[in-house]
């Protein structure tokens, strides 16, 4: 557990290590250490707080892992919201590992199986008209987990054209997608606000 003398999370490398530590705590508390450890990345994800890859996209000589990305544009949300996003994505990993179909429409629509998995882990899940049971909010249980483990807010964020000036903006596993400037395109591109997977 982090002590009172923990350095502020204002450094990218320290933040990346910290997120791995938080995921380990979440895996232990909410998933009985059953989740395969993903490769955690921090990259901009337009319109989403995070995503998890359907396939194992990270490889070395012996191991392949899923990617769990947290959007760099929203890292400075309260820690209980970051934890809620990690639990949300952990539910997708759990579903993948246990052959539970928790989404439909090519991973875009979060169904009632996803809702049940997330609520079993103390999250508050509400329905989004387009994306299903995806709106994810922390509960008192989530906050208690953060307090008991002395988790602290992350104080670094990537400011892009998408994130500047959107204080209080909502996306992905937290609320409706953020409106973004659109580039002309002859095809339609859909992005899941929770897992960030895009489909054409």
Short names for language-model regions:
Residues 84-97:
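Active-site recognition of the HExxH zinc-binding catalytic motif
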């Amino acid at each position: 557990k982090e002590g009172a003398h923990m350095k502020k999370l204002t450094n990218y490398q320290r933040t990346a290590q910290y997120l791995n530590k938080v995921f380990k705590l979440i895996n232990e508390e909410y998933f009985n250490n059953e989740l395969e450890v993903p490769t955690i990345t921090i990259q901009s994800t337009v319109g989403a707080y995070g995503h998890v890859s359907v396939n194992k996209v990270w490889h070395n000589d012996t191991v392949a892992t899923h990617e769990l990305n947290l959007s760099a544009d929203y890292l400075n949300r309260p820690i209980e919201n970051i934890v809620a996003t990690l639990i949300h994505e952990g539910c997708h990993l759990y579903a993948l590992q246990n052959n539970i179909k928790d989404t439909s429409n090519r991973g875009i629509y979060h169904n009632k199986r996803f809702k049940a998995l997330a609520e079993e882990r103390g999250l508050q899940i509400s329905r989004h008209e387009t994306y299903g049971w995806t709106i994810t909010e922390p509960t008192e249980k989530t906050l208690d987990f953060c307090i008991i483990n002395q988790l602290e807010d992350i104080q670094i964020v990537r400011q892009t054209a998408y994130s500047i000036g959107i204080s209080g903006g909502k996306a992905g596993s937290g609320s409706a997608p953020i409106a973004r400037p659109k580039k002309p395109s002859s095809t339609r591109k859909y992005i899941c606000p929770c897992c960030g997977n895009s489909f054409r």
